[in-house]
UniProtKB/Swiss-Prot annotation:
Subunit and interaction comment: Part of the 50S ribosomal subunit.
Job of this protein: One of the primary rRNA binding proteins, this protein initially binds near the 5'-end of the 23S rRNA. It is important during the early stages of 50S assembly. It makes multiple contacts with different domains of the 23S rRNA in the assembled 50S subunit and ribosome.
Protein name per the record: Large ribosomal subunit protein uL4
Source organism of the structure: Hydrogenovibrio crunogenus (strain DSM 25203 / XCL-2) (Thiomicrospira crunogena)
Gene, per the UniProt record: rplD
Family classification: Belongs to the universal ribosomal protein uL4 family.
Start and end residues of each stretch annotated as Disordered: 47-79
Length: 206
């Protein structure tokens, strides 16, 4: 199948680029995309609970007082749950929220997302995407040339100038093919992909 190729300098169509039907023309599997996106979001969660039981609390090694003779109740440690400064009886622990996503599921979800982006004309293929200096206004100007505002730019490799130019924008981001994820793909209104990145995507998802 063919996708329109846009010349970044002019913002006009400059021909077409052949892409894999299996990757950019696959059927949309909503359930699979939902599962993979949720798995990525769950994996980003960090545990916030952390309490100690009686064995984890510092101290309490010495017997507080003699077993007999004082008239007080028997005590073997000062770090039991009923003591001030003691450990919790049933402490909360950090939970691992991560979910397993195997390669077949990941590739299937990515193909479904890219195919849906292509069908809805939210996937923009450009000849190249570079800035001469790390300036946000230069990056925004290039997006304006494409009549885009909310966009993720995918390049062949890490470009420091592009990264620095886009990091202060809440409505735009830059990543390379190696670091793309389904959450970013569904989170932006438009996805800009360079011609070189298309070939890398086809190799990665084949």
């Amino acid at each position: 199948m063919d996708l329109k190729l846009i010349e970044l300098a002019s913002g006009k169509e400059a021909g077409s680029v052949k892409v894999s039907e299996a990757i950019f023309g696959a059927e949309f599997n909503e359930a699979l995309v939902h599962q993979v996106v949720n798995a990525y979001l769950a994996g980003a969660r960090s545990g916030t609970k952390g309490q100690k039981n009686r064995s984890a609390v510092r101290g309490g090694g010495a017997k507080p007082w003699a077993q007999k003779g004082s008239g007080r109740a028997r005590a073997g440690t000062s770090r039991g749950p009923i003591w001030i400064g003691g450990g919790r009886a049933f402490p909360g622990h950090n939970r691992d929220f991560s979910q397993k996503v195997n390669k077949k599921m990941y590739r299937g979800a990515m193909k479904a997302i890219f195919s849906e982006l292509a069908r809805t004309e939210r996937l923009v293929v450009v000849d190249d995407f570079k800035v001469e200096a790390p300036k946000t206004k230069d990056f925004v100007a290039k997006l304006n040339t494409l009549n885009l505002k909310d966009a993720l730019v995918i390049t062949e490799g890490f470009d420091e100038y592009l990264y620095l130019s886009a990091r202060n924008l809440y409505h735009a981001d830059v990543c390379d093919v190696a670091s793309i994820d389904p959450v970013s793909l569904v989170g932006f209104k438009s996805i800009v992909v360079t011609q070189g990145a298309i070939k890398q995507l086809e190799e990665k998802l084949a």
